[in-house]
Amino acid sequence: MDAAELRAMQAPIKERYKADPSAAVITLKAKGSIETEGLTCKVETGRALAVAGLHPASGGSGLELCSGDMLLEALVACAGVTLKAVATALDIPLRSGIVAAEGELDFRGTLGVAKDAPVGFRRIRLRFDIDTDAPQDRLDQLLKLTERYCVVYQTIKSGPPVDVQMARV
């Protein structure tokens, strides 16, 4: 896909959102079932069933997916797609690229071993290794706009309010 095709594809969507801003507000959903056997949650992905369990550092077997890894994978996926879309829109040719994310967790926090240990990632690092002949100023612009428009990156960075409820069934 080139910049003209991307613009043509997105133009009617952008026009609709400009004309009716409420049409741009979409509710994304995820759902999982808590299993009676084992310490797992089966997440419906729309493509397959993903079974998440405890990370080995908190007693898990390592056979199930780890939610922390899934968070990083969502960041990599979103950042990669966003980078490619922005590069396409800016006519920055990319021959290939790798997107990688990593972060440290102190498992004492989630295991309740130390009250001063935070629960969650201390820091996340996101890296793009791309094969291109584009000049550095264009790559700087590409990175800036990728950060600006990546939904998962902005969500992690901004930390929106999260409402939690529990209901008896």
Placement of each model-derived feature along the sequence:
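Extended beta-strand/beta-hairpin segments
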Residues: 1-73, 83-169
